[in-house]
Each structure stands twice: as structure tokens, then as C-alpha cells.
Amino acid sequence: MNAELRLRLSVGLLSAAVIGYEIGLTRLFSFLQHYHYTFLVVSGAVCGLGLGAALSAAIRQGTEGLGRHLGWWAAFCASSMGLGALLLATFPRMPLLLMVAVAGVPFIAAGAFLALVFRVRHTESQRLYCWDLVGAALGILWIVVALEWLGGVAALISAGMLALAASVLLAERLLARLTMLGLLVVLVVALLVARDGAIDLRALAEAADKPMFRALGSGPDGRSTGEVVDTRWSAFARTDLVDRSGDTGLNLYVDGGAGSYMFRFPGDYRRLFFLRREAAFFPYYFGKRERALIIGPGGGADVLYALMTGWRDIEAVEINPEIVDLVRERGDYNGHLYDLQGVDVHTGDGRNYLQRSDRRYDLIALPLVYAEAADLVGYALAENYLFTRE
């Protein structure tokens, strides 16, 4: 493989790694912090890339000397991605500014790498930019799959492996290649460790600033009050199934918040008679009880309310496919709630579903629209477009 092709491939690989790392960080920050902090990732990425480019301008060498730096900048980017992911997972309650600094180092390295590439090969900037864009596009496709298969932390480490592949392509000496291959082995081991769940949930439980973290906190006797039964990562969110007692049901959380309940349902409605005291049960007593639409059913509590009050046709639209999968996989626990006769569950956005549908409903329920209202007190006066046409 000639040097020009190796350089172009390395640009594509590093671009894929950086965009994938950035998207993965938004998912991790959304879980560790509140969702509005994810916008900080985009600002931090742009800032880091700019700082890296400015840093590269301070390097005063000829074209050949600059070329020798490229592989090491890519290796630095790769190692900082892997190390940063592990630090964020191991110390999830570190100060926010420190968290941003740890997450931002790879962008500085990537900014320096790309600036040096275009400086060394300025006559081929159009071709290199094409490889940059193609790599970024493929990186977006790859990170969606990586998040689902590997999870949030391991997906970030796999981004480091892509960046390391770029550095290996640019390594000219045997010792440099061996060093980078050794770093690759370290990243593979870190990925395997993170694959089983590397985030320190105990530290998050001590913070107790999200519903899920409070559910995992300690009771009066010092024992944990909740246990994570299952975890799913996706490009949409992290979804956790938490067992707090196991007597009446399980809790579902999206990015640590937006909690919903999956009741234990043996098929006998008399066992769930206590639900009639719930305030959310009240609307289902009214109307013709023929066709109901539930937007955001979560673990299926509102589906149960509709069934218990005798509604004939129940349609539910859940935007998070992981929740639907978790409910269906635990059909023996919840009485196969989403597959009962008269219950039709769809995955998608509720507003779009209503726009496409020409049906009319006797009741439209939105149980999870304000699920995090208690945690977002500061946003009580913010605009909300959920009930508008646009």
C-alpha cells in the first residue's frame, strides 16, 4: 500500500472515530448528567478541534518532519479515547469541568492531526476532505451499531481502536508499529472489561440526583434498595430494568430518569385491584371505552388500566424500542401484556403516528410525557411543543 493511500485511509478512520466518539459521549453524558448537558459535548468537540488546530500551528518543521508527527497524534487520540472512557465510567461523579476536560482531550489530538494533514498535503486538500467526509458518514453508521452491541463505554473504546488503526497505517518504523500494536492490545482488553458494564453505579447511587440513582441508593439498614436486572444501550438512550422489591413489579428507567412501572401480572385482574386507587386510573372510567390511544406506555401500567376498565381496542405508541423489547421478553412476568388480544403496540413517535393515522379515539393518554417533571423544576416555564401542531 503506497503512502498516499495510507494517509487517505488514516484520515477516514480518524474522522469515523471522532464523530463516533462524539455521538457516544452524548449518550454517556445523558446518563451520567441530565439530558441538557449533552449539548455541551458538541460545543466541547468544536472547541477541542479548534484548540488542536491552533496547537499544530506552533509546530515549526518542514513537510517531512511534520509527516512523522501524524502517527503519534493519531495514537495519542486513540489512547485518550480509551483512557477517557474508562475514567468517566470509573469516576462518574467527578466535577463537571473535569469531566468535560477528560472527554475533550481526544478532540484536541484529532484537531492537531487533521490540521497537520492538510498542512502537509495542502495540494490534495479536496481528496483528503472527501475521505474526511466519507469516514465521518461511515462513523455515524458504525456508532449506532456499536452502542447497541457493545454499550456506551465500550463503544467509546472501540472508537479509540479505529483511531489507533489510523496511527498504525502511518507508522513508518517497526518499533513505532509494535508500540501501537501493543496499545491496540490494551484497548481490546479495556473493551472486553467495559463490555460487561464499567460504570460505577454505587457512586451514582450516592449522588441520588436522578430517579434511577435514588432507586439504587441504600436503605436505613445500609443495603441497596434496588438492583439492575437488565441494561440496554442504543443510539436513543440507555434503558435499565431495576428490581426494587420484586413483589408487585419492576421499574424501567431511560437514561436514569423517565421511570415507568412493569407490574407483575399473572393474568388475574383481581390481583391488581389495588391499582384502582391510582390517580392515573381515573381517566379510564370515562368515555365509550371503545378505542384508546396511549402515547408512551413504558412498562405497560396504562395498558393495564385500560384493560381493567374494559376498553375494547387499545393502541400504544412507544418511542423507545428497547422498552418494548424488555416488556415482551419478560412476558411470563407481566402476563404478555403487549401481546394480549385487543392490545396493539407500535414503536415510533406519538405525534407522527397520529399524523399518519386517520382513526378517531375516545381517549388519548400521555402517561410518560411529564415523567421527569419533578426533576426538571427549573424548566417549569419553558416552552413545550408536545401538544402543538408543529
Question: Each predicted region: which residue ranges?
Answer:
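Alpha-helical transmembrane segments of multi-pass membrane proteins
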Residues: 1-390
